[in-house]
Design a protein with these regions (language model features):
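Beta-strand cores of modular interaction/reader domains in eukaryotic scaffold and signaling proteins
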Residues: 10-12, 64-66, 93-95
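Short structural boundary motif marking the start of a folded domain
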Residues: 5-9
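Helix N-cap motif at beta-to-alpha junctions
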Residues: 66-73
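A common structural junction motif
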Residues: 80-90
Length: 151
C-alpha cells in the first residue's frame, strides 16, 4: 500500500483594509473557484479530493492549507490569481511549503523571530527596544542576535 504524500502551504492573507475577516470555508471556496477557472473541471475535481484548510488564525491572518503532492504545483500557481475572498480584496502571500504541519509551524516561528529582530534594529527609542526584547524573551525564552546586530 502506498502512503499518500501531502504538502502543507503556509500563507499570509494581506487585506486592503484593516479589520476585514474571512473564514476557513471562504478561503477554501476562493481557492477551488480559481483552480476551476485556471484548470477546468478536471483540475478542480482533482484538487478538491485533497484540498483542505487545516489551520486558520484570524488574528494574524495566517493559514495552513493541505493538498496532495501531485497537485501542489497547480495550487501554488493558482494562489497569485486569488484577488477576492468573500468579496474582500486580498493578496495571498506564500511563506513556506513543507511536508508537515510541524515544519510549517517551525517556519512561522522562524519568520516571526526574524521580524522581531528586524523591528529591534529599526527601533528608534530605548523604550521601543526594551519592549521588543521583552516580547522576544516571552516567546523564545532567550535573546540572541544572529549576524543582525553587533553590540
Amino acid at each position: 500500500m502506498v502512503k499518500l504524500k501531502n504538502r502543507y502551504i503556509l500563507m499570509d492573507i494581506l487585506f486592503d483594509e484593516k479589520g476585514d475577516v474571512v473564514t476557513e470555508s471562504a478561503i477554501y471556496v476562493a481557492l477551488c473557484k480559481q483552480i476551476g477557472i485556471l484548470f477546468g473541471d478536471y483540475g478542480m475535481a482533482a484538487a478538491k479530493l485533497s484540498l483542505s484548510v487545516k489551520v486558520f488564525d484570524a488574528g494574524t491572518a495566517t493559514t495552513i492549507i493541505r493538498i496532495s503532492k501531485e497537485f501542489a504545483q497547480r495550487l501554488l500557481s493558482t494562489i497569485p490569481f486569488v484577488c477576492k475572498i468573500d468579496a474582500i480584496s486580498v493578496v495571498l502571500q506564500v511563506l513556506f511549503v513543507g511536508s508537515s504541519i510541524r515544519s510549517c509551524q517551525r517556519a512561522l516561528l522562524r519568520i516571526n523571530r526574524k521580524n522581531l529582530y528586524s523591528n529591534y534594529i529599526t527601533a528608534k527609542t530605548k523604550g521601543e527596544k526594551k519592549d521588543i526584547i521583552e516580547a522576544i524573551r516571552s516567546v523564545t525564552g532567550n535573546v540572541k542576535f544572529e549576524n543582525t546586530f553587533n553590540g
